Amino acid sequence: MLEVLPARGKDLTAAELLAVAADPIRWTLLNQLAADGSCVCKLQEHVPIAANLLSYHLKVLREAGLVTTSRRGRWIDYALAPAALDRLHAALPGAVTTAPVP
Protein backbone atom coordinates (compact mmCIF):
# COMPACT_ATOMS: atom_id res chain seq x y z
CA MET A 1 0.00 0.00 0.00
CA LEU A 2 1.33 3.43 -0.96
CA GLU A 3 0.72 6.24 1.54
CA VAL A 4 1.80 9.76 0.65
CA LEU A 5 2.93 11.84 3.60
CA PRO A 6 2.37 15.59 3.15
CA ALA A 7 5.21 18.09 3.42
CA ARG A 8 4.85 20.40 6.37
CA GLY A 9 5.92 23.43 4.30
CA LYS A 10 6.70 26.01 6.95
CA ASP A 11 6.34 29.61 5.89
CA LEU A 12 10.02 30.37 5.51
CA THR A 13 11.57 33.64 4.45
CA ALA A 14 13.62 33.59 1.26
CA ALA A 15 16.85 33.64 3.25
CA GLU A 16 15.68 30.78 5.51
CA LEU A 17 14.66 28.63 2.54
CA LEU A 18 18.00 29.19 0.83
CA ALA A 19 19.84 28.48 4.10
CA VAL A 20 18.10 25.11 4.31
CA ALA A 21 19.20 24.25 0.78
CA ALA A 22 22.71 25.69 1.18
CA ASP A 23 23.91 23.04 3.63
CA PRO A 24 26.35 20.85 1.63
CA ILE A 25 24.69 17.58 2.66
CA ARG A 26 21.19 18.86 1.94
CA TRP A 27 22.37 20.33 -1.38
CA THR A 28 23.73 16.91 -2.37
CA LEU A 29 20.43 15.29 -1.35
CA LEU A 30 18.41 17.82 -3.37
CA ASN A 31 20.56 17.19 -6.43
CA GLN A 32 20.20 13.44 -6.06
CA LEU A 33 16.44 13.68 -5.58
CA ALA A 34 16.14 16.00 -8.59
CA ALA A 35 17.71 13.25 -10.68
CA ASP A 36 15.61 10.44 -9.21
CA GLY A 37 13.48 9.81 -6.13
CA SER A 38 15.05 7.35 -3.74
CA CYS A 39 14.74 5.45 -0.52
CA VAL A 40 17.12 6.24 2.33
CA CYS A 41 19.27 3.23 1.50
CA LYS A 42 20.05 4.62 -1.98
CA LEU A 43 20.55 8.17 -0.75
CA GLN A 44 23.07 6.92 1.78
CA GLU A 45 25.28 5.77 -1.10
CA HIS A 46 25.70 9.42 -2.15
CA VAL A 47 26.26 10.98 1.27
CA PRO A 48 28.68 9.12 3.55
CA ILE A 49 27.05 10.03 6.88
CA ALA A 50 25.39 8.09 9.67
CA ALA A 51 21.78 7.04 9.12
CA ASN A 52 20.48 9.22 11.95
CA LEU A 53 22.19 12.30 10.48
CA LEU A 54 20.79 11.51 7.04
CA SER A 55 17.31 11.22 8.54
CA TYR A 56 17.77 14.59 10.25
CA HIS A 57 18.72 16.33 6.98
CA LEU A 58 15.80 14.72 5.14
CA LYS A 59 13.47 15.87 7.93
CA VAL A 60 14.74 19.46 7.59
CA LEU A 61 14.16 19.35 3.82
CA ARG A 62 10.69 17.87 4.30
CA GLU A 63 9.69 20.44 6.91
CA ALA A 64 10.84 23.20 4.55
CA GLY A 65 8.56 21.74 1.87
CA LEU A 66 11.43 20.90 -0.48
CA VAL A 67 11.04 17.12 -0.23
CA THR A 68 8.01 14.84 -0.20
CA THR A 69 7.76 11.32 1.12
CA SER A 70 5.68 8.28 0.30
CA ARG A 71 5.46 5.08 2.28
CA ARG A 72 5.70 1.61 0.73
CA GLY A 73 5.18 -0.83 3.57
CA ARG A 74 8.25 -0.37 5.78
CA TRP A 75 10.09 1.78 3.23
CA ILE A 76 9.88 5.54 2.86
CA ASP A 77 10.68 6.96 -0.56
CA TYR A 78 11.83 10.56 -0.91
CA ALA A 79 11.32 12.84 -3.90
CA LEU A 80 11.91 16.47 -4.73
CA ALA A 81 8.69 18.39 -4.04
CA PRO A 82 7.00 19.45 -7.29
CA ALA A 83 7.41 23.18 -6.58
CA ALA A 84 10.82 22.95 -4.86
CA LEU A 85 12.90 24.32 -7.72
CA ASP A 86 10.38 27.11 -8.38
CA ARG A 87 10.40 28.08 -4.69
CA LEU A 88 14.20 28.16 -4.57
CA HIS A 89 14.37 30.17 -7.79
CA ALA A 90 11.75 32.63 -6.50
CA ALA A 91 13.64 33.00 -3.20
CA LEU A 92 16.82 34.27 -4.86
CA PRO A 93 15.73 37.88 -5.58
CA GLY A 94 14.13 38.17 -2.13
CA ALA A 95 17.25 36.94 -0.39
CA VAL A 96 19.45 39.34 -2.31
CA THR A 97 17.32 42.38 -1.49
CA THR A 98 16.68 41.51 2.17
CA ALA A 99 20.02 40.07 3.23
CA PRO A 100 21.88 42.18 5.79
CA VAL A 101 24.95 43.96 4.51
CA PRO A 102 28.08 43.10 6.52
Task: Label the predicted regions.
Residues 45, 62-63:
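Alpha-helical residues within the helix-turn-helix
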